[in-house]
Amino acid sequence: MTRPEAVNIAERLFAGLSGEFRAVVEATQDGVVAGLGFVDPSLAPAEAGRWRALAEEGQPVTAGTPLVEVIGNAAELGVAEDYVLGPLGFASGIATRAYQFKEACPPGLSIACGGWKKLPAPLKPLLRAGLAAAGLLPRLVAGDFVYISKNAVTLLGSVEQAIRAGLAVDHGPVAVQVKNVEEALFAARAGAGVIMVDTASLDDLAAVH
């Protein structure tokens, strides 16, 4: 693994310090812990001390709660800072906001987040970890299904033709994106198992419902 220049600078900066130090990462606000599986010293590009989780994945915490302990020399703590805070902060931020959505969700309604698929590849596992910690689904439904986006509907010619193509795949129910009541009715008649109103308009959702 290539050593970043920041590591070399940290080692030179702290060259005059000896002995071990202890650092503790604490929550700065109330939230939900996520991403601990990615807080791994072996992922750092240089020696980063000894790390120990002080909280559990999915644990609700208050501001000031200790999350991770790092013990090492000054240079190791300097390296650890960049590789502990990032994954923990990103995933926990997602988990905290996702948990707020879940708590505000009416009874009988579930929340799924499929937007993680469009994130840069390195961020996808952290977002999924945040969703899992909050108890949100990363997919529309559990199990196998065929997802047909608006773009796929356009390419296949119509909602009805798209659903027929999806059913022919024979990989579970067909989930299709629609824009209005007319398309939703076509989808239902054509055999769609899941109808997704994808306009970001609550009025459109209410009309289809």
Where are these regions (language model features)?
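Acidic/glycine-rich phosphate/pyrophosphate-binding loops and surrounding catalytic core
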Residues: 1-190, 194, 200, 206
